[in-house]
Structures are given as structure tokens and as C-alpha cells.
């Protein structure tokens, strides 16, 4: 078994077998605390193209202290439907039952996303499998398409979950991030698929995974792949934070005060750039083990006052006052370059409900990079990042890196920087 420690460089878990052959893409990562185990998922493809996806694969990582030993790759053949390709792994751990739910979509044949959108006829199925033993064995597949989407599927040209992890809220609700290409107009009995626009939304369960439902589309902004994190303010009120991919050169952020049923109007974060056409990114929340004294006055006494967040309207803002650190912090991973997918960065936000509070990025990987997924180990001060990377292309491998909260604080060069001040990243 391969071993990774918190002080080591990134370790490849899935490696491209041939430049025009078998490729692994679309990472997803969760940590199962009772088993001290990471579950690292990816798509196995016959080429790097989306339409050449085959099935999902898994590697289990057993953690001892600040090191992880990885078991060999395992193909998840139960996560399949006949005549379909399996895509977009999105796992979530349910803490009461101990179940791991692995959501994904199954898409007919080799039809491309563009073909799905133009036809206006959804060929995707919403499915999951589950495990009671931290990924050793898995249930048979369950198709939730009719249960969750139902007749509304006629307005969805296509949809997908994740990719990346889902979460469980303090209330017990399980959340699976998703997006759908929504067709708003019909002309008599005919769809108008060219009008389809993507919008993020949440799929959720309030009964430990027995039944599932979907929330409202996040509008009006075009948003695609997203992840969410629960933020607890100083007053103890939970807010669900959503970070979504956009084609608008900046990341979209939105907040929900009803556990993800609906979100307020999203806004663009000018501190978090997107490359052309955007890229998936990951976000996790965590409670800091300690707040270093030097981080209390993050920008200095002469710095501009912290702005109230445009995300959350003042009538429902849970924070007692501006400029206070939240009980929850956010960590975010994404390519840092505005022009192309290179230089994977880790950003820290110590006041998620305030504006302009993202740190400069700590560069975890220099060079081509792509999709990523983060996992936070509660009460351990440890984090895992599973990410696409390479020396010439982003699809050469999917690597894993383990790091500590102290490493983050030592690399992000202070925190709440004002807009436009986070242009100089910290290299690893």
C-alpha cells in the first residue's frame, strides 16, 4: 500500500495509462471518521472525453495520525445501469447510521452534453449506491429519477450531481449539490431547448437517506457545478454557503437560510477568479482548533472596514456585527489563473458572512490542474485534497495531498484582504 504523510508532496492515486487511452477524471473525496478512512472516487474513461466515461473507481485510504495508507484501486461495477455510462461521483457520509451514500448520474451511450441540451430530452438518470462498512462493500444501484425529479424532468434538458462531496447539516439533512439545464419555454407542444440555461440546486433528504427531494433552482445567474458548506455564525445560526462555477470569469456565491431549499440571489466574488468557461472547485467548512492572536486583526488597524456581505440581506443576517470572526471558517480549492487551468490554490476565509474575506491562495500544485475535492477532518486540524494535475495536461493524474491547519495559516499570508489584493499567491 502507498503511504502519504502531511509533510509529503502530493501522491498520485489514479494515473493516466495512455495519452489517448484510459484516463481518470472527476475526483470526489470524503472522510469516514469512525473507520479513520478516506474514500477517493474518480471516473474511469477510455479517453479524456466526457462521452467516453466508463464507470467509477475507488481507493480507500486508512489514516493513522498524519499518514494515510492507500489500498489498491477497485472498480465500482454496482454503480452502473445497462447501456449507460457512469459519471460525477458525489459521496456523503450520514453520521447517525454510518452509511456512505454515493450519488452519480448514468447517461445513455455516448451522447454528449451538447447533444443532450440541443435535443431537450433528458437521457440522464439520478442514481446512488450505499455502503455500511466505509466502502468495503456496496448495495445494488437505486434509480431516483422519478422520485426526485418526476414530471418536472420535461423542463430539464439534462442534469448532473456534484461532482465532489455532499454534506450533512447539523439538523441531520443530507445535501447533494446538483445542477440542471432548465428549459423555461415551450411553443405549443414543442420544447425550445436552445433556451436552456444551467442553474445549481440541491437534492436533499431529511430521513437519513430513505427519501429524497430537490430544492429550487438558484436564479437568475447561470451557475453550473457547485459545492456547499454549512457556516455557523457567532450567534449560532446556521447558514448554507454555495460556491458555484460560472462562465463569468468569477465564482458565484449564494447563501440559504432554510437548509438549501432555496438560495438568495447569487453574486460574483471578485476575489475568486474563473478561467475561461470556468472550472469546478471545492469548499469545506470547519471550526478552527484555535484562533492565532495574529489573525484577529487580519488586515491591520489602517485597513478599510470590512464590508457587510452582499450575499445575505440585512433583515436576516445572523452575525451580530461586522468584522467578527465566524465560528466556522471556509477552505476553497480551485485553479488560480484567470486565463487557463493552472496552479491549484487553497484559499481561506475566516469570516464567510462578510465581503472580501478570502485570503491569497496557497499554491498546492504548480502547473496544469483541474477539478478538485476537499475533505476536512473535524477536531483533527487535518485536511485532504484530491485533485487533477499533470506536467503538460491536467488529466495526467489525480493526486492526493494531506495538510494541516497550521500549514494553511503559514502559507496564506494573512487573511481578509480587500478586493484586488490577492493577486500574489503563496507557493508551496
UniProtKB/Swiss-Prot annotation:
Main location: membrane
Signal peptide feature range: none
Gene3D superfamilies per UniProt: 2.120.10.10
Active site per the UniProt annotation: 50 (proton acceptor), 371 (nucleophile), 388
Membrane topology: Peripheral membrane protein
Annotated substrate binding sites: 25, 45, 179, 181, 225, 245, 341
Catalytic activities: Hydrolysis of alpha-(2->3)-, alpha-(2->6)-, alpha-(2->8)- glycosidic linkages of terminal sialic acid residues in oligosaccharides, glycoproteins, glycolipids, colominic acid and synthetic substrates; a ganglioside GD1a + H2O = a ganglioside GM1 + N-acetylneuraminate; a ganglioside GD1a (d18:1(4E)) + H2O = a ganglioside GM1 (d18:1(4E)) + N-acetylneuraminate; a ganglioside GD1b + H2O = a ganglioside GM1 + N-acetylneuraminate
One cellular component term from this protein's GO annotations in UniProt: plasma membrane
Broadest EC class assigned to this enzyme: hydrolase
Localization annotation: Cell membrane; Membrane, Caveola; Early endosome membrane; Recycling endosome membrane
Residue ranges the record marks as coiled coil: none
Motif (FRIP motif): 24-27
Protein purpose: Exo-alpha-sialidase that catalyzes the hydrolytic cleavage of the terminal sialic acid (N-acetylneuraminic acid, Neu5Ac) of a glycan moiety in the catabolism of glycolipids, glycoproteins and oligosacharides. Displays high catalytic efficiency for gangliosides including alpha-(2->3)-sialylated GD1a and GM3 and alpha-(2->8)-sialylated GD3. Plays a role in the regulation of transmembrane signaling through the modulation of ganglioside content of the lipid bilayer and by direct interaction with signaling receptors, such as EGFR.
Family according to the record: Belongs to the glycosyl hydrolase 33 family.
Record text on subunit structure and interactions: Interacts with CAV1; this interaction enhances NEU3 sialidase activity within caveola. Interacts with EGFR; this interaction mediates desialylation of EGFR and enhances downstream signaling.
Protein's UniProt name: Sialidase-3
Organism, as annotated: Bos taurus (Bovine)
Name of the coding gene: NEU3
